Amino acid sequence: MSVRNSRPQLSWPERVSPQRTIDTPTASGEMLTRRQSAPALVVPPEETTHVVVVKRQSPDAAAAGELVPSRRKDSVAVQSGIVATGPLDTTRSGARDDFLMALLECPVCFGYIMPPIMQCPRGHLICSTCRSKLTICPVCRVFMTNIRSLAMEKVASKLIFPCKHSHFGCRARLSYAEKTKHEEDCECRPYFCPYPDDKCSWQGPLRDVYQHLMSSHENVITMEGNDIIFLATNVNLEGALDWTMVQSCHGRHFLLSLEKINLGEDCQQYFTACRMIGSMKDAAEFVYNISLEAYNRTLRWQSKPRSIRENFSSFTNADFLVLNKHTVELFSEDGNLALNVVIRKVEERTN
């Protein structure tokens, strides 16, 4: 016969008896009623369970990414192969960091304020980007000054921030020194339409950019191969014009563009660009060559392709082939300009 262990009895504080009053005479003979204090109910502080993220092998773990119990009662282990991207919100330090990051929200753009952190004379914080556009504080309406909050800059240097593209799926958590660089080329950052006329407002993930070009910009054609001829027709027509096509090679898509810009009367320039439909990191793995040949003349250009992250309107400040009207006339035949484009992958150097 098995004997069932009785459950331990819970100890509750004794029931507080009804309050009794005690009459105390005063110096003048009046009777004052004094209320007897009831016994205080002491609630023990709730124990805080710390969560420690470790990386170890578990021979009997079910699958990758499964949480497996550690030997310590107050810790949780993560199976090897999963890297934690930031502190867990259930820890005390996570709650503290969330509170501090909430203090660093810009009241104008609602983004996190990164150093240099500006403040108004009354101490309200604002990011440097919004500060350059405002003359009065958006909170208290006093005139802004160029006062930096050095204390909050030190606080920001100790915090780990989420990527601003977290609502698109990015799970990276970074220091403020790494945050800006990561967000410029974040894989989850939406891409804008790379067509050079800047009239298309489409944006979406990288995997949909090429399909968008084919479906929404019918004049864009695709040529296969790493060595092609990009033919721009009627380059002598008046006005601002552009010619665009896609070159597919090395398992990638490259957007070739020739844009004619009027800078003034009788002053026209042609900007030739090769941009990769991909990230800036991927674009750095390739090199392209553009050559023009006509009437025993040869012009060659070599550079690295840019990513479509960069706006086409920034061509004048970028590293692209620029031709003036006279040069185009020298290399064009019957008003058509033929550009030989060769794209190759950069070979890794061996030590």
Curated annotation (Swiss-Prot):
UniProt KW keywords: Metal-binding, Transferase, Ubl conjugation pathway, Zinc, Zinc-finger
Residues binding Zn(2+) 2, per UniProt: C193, C200, H212, H217
Region feature (Disordered): 1-38
Gene knockout outcome: Flies are viable. In combination with a mutation in ebi, flies show an extra dorsal central bristle phenotype. Flies that lack both sina and sinah show visible eye and bristle phenotypes, which can be explained by an inability to degrade the neuronal repressor, Tramtrack.
Family annotation (Pfam families): Sina_RING (PF21362), Sina_TRAF (PF03145), Sina_ZnF (PF21361)
Reactions listed under catalytic activity: S-ubiquitinyl-[E2 ubiquitin-conjugating enzyme]-L-cysteine + [acceptor protein]-L-lysine = [E2 ubiquitin-conjugating enzyme]-L-cysteine + N(6)-ubiquitinyl-[acceptor protein]-L-lysine
Residues annotated as binding Zn(2+) 1: C163, C170, H182, C186
A single BP term in Gene Ontology: regulation of R7 cell differentiation
Zinc finger (SIAH-type): 158-218
InterPro entries the record matches: 7-in-absentia-prot_TRAF-dom, SINA-like_animal, Sina-like_RING, TRAF-like, Znf_RING, Znf_RING/FYVE/PHD, Znf_SIAH
Zinc finger extent (RING-type): 106-141
Coiled coil feature spans: none
Domain notes: The RING-type zinc finger domain is essential for ubiquitin ligase activity. The SBD domain (substrate-binding domain) mediates the homodimerization and the interaction with substrate proteins. It is related to the TRAF family.
Entry function: E3 ubiquitin-protein ligase that mediates ubiquitination and subsequent proteasomal degradation of target proteins. The adapter phyl is required to direct the degradation of the two isoforms of the transcriptional repressor Tramtrack (Ttk). E3 ubiquitin ligases accept ubiquitin from an E2 ubiquitin-conjugating enzyme in the form of a thioester and then directly transfers the ubiquitin to targeted substrates. It probably triggers the ubiquitin-mediated degradation of different substrates.
Family label: Belongs to the SINA (Seven in absentia) family.
Known partners and oligomeric status: Interacts with ebi and phyl.
Protein name: Probable E3 ubiquitin-protein ligase sinah
